[in-house]
Amino acid sequence: MIRLFCGHDEREAIGTHVFISSVLRRTSQPVSFLPLNIKGMQRDGSNAFIYSRFLVPWISGYKGTAIFADGADMLCRADIAELWDLQDPHMAVQVVKHDYISQYTRKYVGTSMEANNESYSRKNWSSLMIINCAHYAWRKITPESIVDMSGPDLHRFTFIDERYIGMLPFAWNHLVMEYPHSQNVKIAHFTLGIPAFKEYRHCPFAGEWQDEVREVTRHIDANYE
């Protein structure tokens, strides 16, 4: 069973449903989903799961492996089992190691979520993770300890020895509008804003995202007219 924790924010709830649907329609293995939104962990105007993602090992009893994906602003275009098969038991965490400066100074433009889009070291590394919950490096991360840690320390994995931060292929966390368009993308990450928002309605992969919305709602439309 693939365990997949995905971010959920009520302000872009449709995005969570789209992501889950896109995973389920393509997976070759059973998937267990846990939308993640732990109250009280949000410290700023960012999404509701910005810090709670680091509690996945604690939630899991420091056992097994799990995937965390931002989810609410992602579209899965491949079999999630392919990602699951990339897990390395020697690593504490595996991520796509982005190294970029954003082309955009604002994100979620035109919505109540609109905010500055700051560039910083290891930006978006934590937005897609294969987490080895049993690795000793995670033992220091608890609901109590996380309160005293800064956002940058968490998102840059300063609590994990560099040797135990593994690399995943870029196709599994493609930053839409930041990276050149490619049809080989496995997970499209609408990090600036999902196509439900007017500003991003025609961005790359928006058509596929909107097709997934129709897939999510078509049975409702047919059965509850």
Q: Would you name each region that the model predicts?
A:
Residues 13-21, 51:
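Short amphipathic alpha-helical segment that frequently serves as the phosphate-/nucleotide-binding helix
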Residues 1-5, 11, 17, 28-29, ...:
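A glycosyltransferase accessory/donor-loop signature
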Residues 85-153:
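Conserved catalytic core of nucleotide-sugar-dependent glycosyltransferases
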Residues 31-62:
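Active-site-proximal specificity loops/subdomain of glycosyltransferases
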Residues 52-104, 130:
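GT-A fold catalytic core of metal-dependent nucleotide-sugar glycosyltransferases
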Residues 22-30:
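Short, acidic, metal-binding catalytic loop of nucleotide-sugar glycosyltransferases
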Residues 39-43, 101-103, 173-177:
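A short acidic, often aromatic-flanked loop/helix-cap motif at beta-alpha or helix-coil junctions
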Residues 12-13, 76:
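Alpha-helix N-cap/loop-to-helix initiation residues
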